[in-house]
Amino acid sequence: MDIQASLFVPPLLGEVFWEMERFFKLKEHGTNVRTEIMAGLTTFMTMAYILAVNPLILTPTGLDWTAVFLATALAAGIFTIAMGLFVNFPVALAPGMGLNAYFASVIVASMATDTPISPAMGLTAVFISGIIFIILTVTQVRQMLITAVPDSLKHAITVGIGLFIAIIGLKNSGLMTIAVSSFNDIQAFNFTPVTGNETVIQLGSFSNETVLFTVIALFLIAILMVMRVPGAILFGILGTTVIALLTGHVDAKTALSGQTWAPDFTKLNFFHFDFAGVFEVGLITVILTFTFVELFDTFGTLVGTANRAGYMKNPEEGKKRVGKAMFVDAVGVSGGAVLGTSTVTAFVESSAGIAQGGRTGLTAVTTGVCFLLAIFLSPLVALVPPAATAAALIIVGVLMMQSVKEIDFSDMVYAIPSFFTLALMPFTYNIANGISFGIVSYVVLATVANVSGKGNKYKVHWLMWVLAVLIIYRYGFLGGH
């Protein structure tokens, strides 16, 4: 058997490899078992940081660290394997950056108000958004929504989320400080006038150890990325953790206190929902934001990875595969909420595995198995200092900024809405605000340009009008917060 001979494996293992080749159609896609497994490991290394970062972001909401860690590993493992087995696609899924931050910010912000939102309500909102996404996928409405929003605005959403993530990293690290009022005061709308203040946002003090270790982590990750080391973010986090342990910044005994190598599945927030609370508090906007962002984020990631893997050479086959992948992704959103984590989405880091030659679902299955094995490594993740994960957030923001070059800033009809979108997300600490102002301003400017004849005939899809009216109603009559 050629597979067995080329890999020097025992007969039984050779038969297993042969079955893998047959099931995943490896020859048809010009790949082999070894290449796929190596690609899967590469993808895992590039996105394993989510195991440390997701618990860091979600625990301020009141969710238990261990529960979030287990939910993250399980959701990533289960739905990445599902992507590999049912779609034969080399794409991995995990709780997404940006939406996890939005999830946390909505809950934390509500703590200072008369209508606090519980983690159970937040998970319910994620679950409902997943159901909506499934319906949109099955009914093909998702295609209409995707074509309705101008490309520049789609890219601005990606950039805005990147800046939003970077702001969180800068804040958590202490590199960025706000010397006006506490977060709770601001979110309770007890605003301090700042028009007379020369500086609102300031650089943190380098006498703070966390700030210093964040800078170390940033340079370490950046150098590894410049050297094109696969898994640069993960290795940067690990390197910073080792330095923190050696210098005493992290005390291993304290960090490992109460940790166990055997996963405690009883801590999982399984089916931790509160449907009545969601509609009592009025989380419709939050649900729609989850759905809206997930829609474009997933579409962009899946089309981009499908293109890199060569599936779009046959447009019909490519569209069919992306459609199936979107369905698995949609199920993953609700499935992740059932397990107790924020929105699960396709990871753009999957392109790292594709660059290593991954072409089939075997790449995804390998990545998924790695995530399931990581369940037994929670004590090691507990050693990771906040500075390392904060640096990872900042670097993820850098990576998402790459989409800015796709925005047409030469045309004000696209430039102004795009700027509102990407600027308001980080500076109002709310993804929904950026999307809302972007959509409304585009509809207004495109309509004025069309009616006045001062510009090209800009396409304003009827769905954009519907969204604009709903947004104006929300901010005008329901309050903008």
Each language-model region and where it sits:
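Loop-to-helix transition at the N-terminal end of transmembrane alpha-helices
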Residues: G62-I81
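Transmembrane alpha-helix boundary and packing residues in multipass membrane permease domains
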Residues: A52-L56, T72, T80, A101, ...
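Short helix-coil transition sites and intra-membrane helix breaks within transmembrane domains
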Residues: M45-Y49, F86-G96, F133-L136, R228-V229, ...
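N-terminal amphipathic/basic-hydrophobic helices that include classical n-h-c signal peptides
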Residues: M1-W18
